[in-house]
Amino acid sequence: MSKATKRKHVVKEVLGDYVQPTEHQSIVKVLGSPGNNLHEVETAEGERFLASMPTKFRKNIWIKRGDFLIVDPIVEGEKVKAEIAFILYKDHQRLLQKEGLWPEGFTQDKTGLVAKEKESSGIQSTEAQAKPQGEDSETDDDSGLFVNTNHVHYEDSEEESESEEDEEN
């Protein structure tokens, strides 16, 4: 099987299948990747350990911090205590939550994050209401714009622009 065909089948399997964890499997959250196809994960109870990525996923599927996985336990492992069985994307997570198979420890994290986001957006909305309506400070503020570091940045001062206007008149 060629690499492209293998990648196609692996991606189709990961994105298309809806898998429920068995009694031995558990759902974990990725905390980081120390390297060598190992990922530091945390269970809903707060236990941290390393999980290895099987060869079928390597260089085909990418896992980032904050993703959720279904892992198979490795009994004889001291540091590496699990092997990744399945990667859970948003659709998979919603389905498991609807079926009641989602761990309580992870649902509390999500509701906590949502509450924090609402609080921060509430603060921003009150700040927007506190500004006078006549000021157009949003148009003058360029701090939110992307800065291209590949181009030389020239500083324009008001004095130079005023003197250029005087010379033109």
From Swiss-Prot:
Localization annotation: Nucleus
Compositionally biased region (Acidic residues): 156-169
Region (Disordered): 115-169
PROSITE patterns reported for this sequence: S1_IF1_TYPE
Database matches in SMART domains: eIF1a
Record's keyword terms, sorted: Nucleus, RNA-binding
Pfam families: eIF-1a
Function: May play a role into cellular response to oxidative stress. May decrease cell proliferation.
Name this protein carries in UniProt: Probable RNA-binding protein EIF1AD
Organism: Xenopus laevis
Phylogenetic lineage: Eukaryota, Metazoa, Chordata, Craniata, Vertebrata
